Structure formats: structure tokens, C-alpha cells
């Protein structure tokens, strides 16, 4: 009986020692890395490409609610075509003589080219330039990975991001041939829960230079962002 009792004491002692050994803290430290955002559709100063960057200040200076091709018409090797003669409605562009079917266009990294014709119909994106932070135009074969539309040139569009403080703004433009544009924009700024909401409403009207060139466009742009200590969504 004493031998059995002694064996039980030994087993309990071994089990207690094993639990204590498992409870010891791990000496290896765990490091949580912050989120890294990689943008691979734009060229840098060391990239062997011919490109032009247009910042937000220059976009605001040249913007009068016209479509992107007309806003960029002063760039080298770029020709803008506008059917109505006012810069709104049906517009297109050529870069180094290449038509729209070989010019790849991305918005925040997402391709805008039509999957069938490979063109971008700017008439469906009225007053987009008012919501952009920057544009990069790459002449010739560029950094895009979105298929055959990048053979002639590439255009990378980036929309405005959230601001720290709330804001509100309004603008109105009047031009020839009954052209009128008005837009209202507002943003909440960074809220306590990390959310930020930005929205813009635009209205573009024009009689056009030619017959049947009338334009009546409405555009609504909205962006919802969430910022945390380690991540941006």
C-alpha cells in the first residue's frame, strides 16, 4: 500500500513540473507589421519610360468640368478630339498617333477600358477630373499589366483621398454655346471611429457647337474610407 501511495506522489510531482514548464513565457517576441500599400501601375524617376505627372493643383487650374482628354490636351504628343466642340460629351484622344483602343486607362489601379473595343468612353465619366488627385500619362509601352490596350500608351488616374478635417465647396462654370457646369462637394473628415466620407455632385449642360451636340450630364462621386492603427480600407 505504501508503494502505491509513493508512486502516486511521484506521478503528481512529475505532472506539476510539466505544467510549470509549459506555463513559462515564450522568449520569442511577436512583431505586427503595419499595412503596406503597393502601387505598381505608375512609373518612377528610375523607370526607363517617357511619362508626365499631373498633380491636384494643376488639375484644378485646368479643370472647367470638361472631360479628361480636353484637360490633358496640352501634354506632349497628345491630341484631344471633342465632337460637340465644347470639351464635354463625346470626346476621345490619341497619344503618339495611337488611337483609344491601344491606350490603357486605370482608375485607382482598376482598368476602365471596354472589354470588347478596348476604348474608354469618356462621355460616361462626366466631370471626373474634379474628383482626381493626380494623373500619370505614359507615352509608349508602359508599366500596365492589363492587356493589349497598353501597347500605345497608359493613363493612371487616382482619386482624391480622405481629409483630416471636414470641408465643403461649390463651383460654377459658364462657357460658350450654352455650356454650364455646377458642382457641390463635401467631406466629413476623419471621424472618431476612423471613418471618412467624401461626396461630390456635378451637373453639366451644353447646347454644343454643332447640331445634335446637346449634353445633359449628372455625376455623383462618393468615397468611404476607414483608417485604423494598422490598416486603411
Spell out what each predicted region is.
Residues 34, 91, 151-153, 166-168, ...:
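Hydrophobic, lipid-facing positions within transmembrane beta-strands of outer-membrane proteins
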Residues 33-63, 92, 135:
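N-terminal periplasmic "start-of-domain" segments of outer-membrane beta-barrel proteins
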Residues 132-134, 153, 159-174, 197-199:
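Transmembrane beta-strand segments of Gram-negative outer membrane beta-barrel proteins
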Residues 176-205, 210-233:
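Transmembrane beta-barrel wall of Gram-negative outer-membrane proteins
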Residues 69, 73-111, 133:
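Extracytoplasmic beta-strand/coil segments of soluble accessory domains associated
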Residues 41, 140, 158, 171-177, ...:
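Outer-membrane beta-barrel pore domains and translocons
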Residues 70, 94, 136, 156, ...:
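Outer-membrane beta-barrel architecture
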Residues 111-139, 158:
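Short acidic/polar hinge/loop motifs at secondary-structure boundaries
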Amino acid at each position: 500500500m505504501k508503494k502505491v501511495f509513493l508512486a502516486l506522489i511521484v506521478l503528481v510531482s512529475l505532472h506539476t513540473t510539466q505544467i510549470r514548464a509549459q506555463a513559462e513565457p515564450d522568449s520569442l517576441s511577436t512583431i505586427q507589421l503595419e499595412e503596406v500599400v503597393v502601387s505598381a501601375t505608375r512609373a518612377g524617376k528610375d523607370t526607363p519610360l517617357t511619362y508626365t505627372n499631373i498633380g491636384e493643383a494643376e488639375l484644378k487650374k485646368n479643370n472647367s468640368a470638361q472631360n479628361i482628354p480636353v484637360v490633358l490636351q496640352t501634354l506632349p504628343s497628345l491630341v484631344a478630339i471633342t465632337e460637340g466642340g465644347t470639351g464635354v460629351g463625346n470626346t476621345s484622344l490619341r497619344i503618339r498617333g495611337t488611337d483609344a483602343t491601344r491606350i490603357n486607362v486605370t482608375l485607382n489601379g482598376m482598368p476602365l477600358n471596354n472589354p470588347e473595343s478596348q476604348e474608354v468612353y469618356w462621355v460616361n465619366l462626366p466631370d471626373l477630373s474634379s474628383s482626381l488627385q493626380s494623373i500619370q500619362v505614359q507615352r509608349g509601352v508602359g508599366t500596365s499589366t492589363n492587356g493589349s490596350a497598353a501597347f500605345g500608351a497608359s493613363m493612371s488616374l487616382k482619386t482624391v483621398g480622405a481629409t483630416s478635417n471636414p470641408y465643403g465647396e461649390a463651383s460654377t462654370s459658364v462657357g460658350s454655346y450654352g455650356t454650364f457646369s455646377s458642382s457641390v462637394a463635401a467631406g466629413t473628415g476623419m471621424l472618431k471611429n476612423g471613418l471618412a466620407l467624401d461626396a461630390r455632385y456635378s451637373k453639366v449642360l451644353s447646347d454644343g457647337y454643332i447640331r445634335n451636340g446637346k449634353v445633359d450630364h449628372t455625376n455623383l462621386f462618393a468615397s468611404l474610407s476607414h483608417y485604423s492603427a494598422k490598416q486603411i480600407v
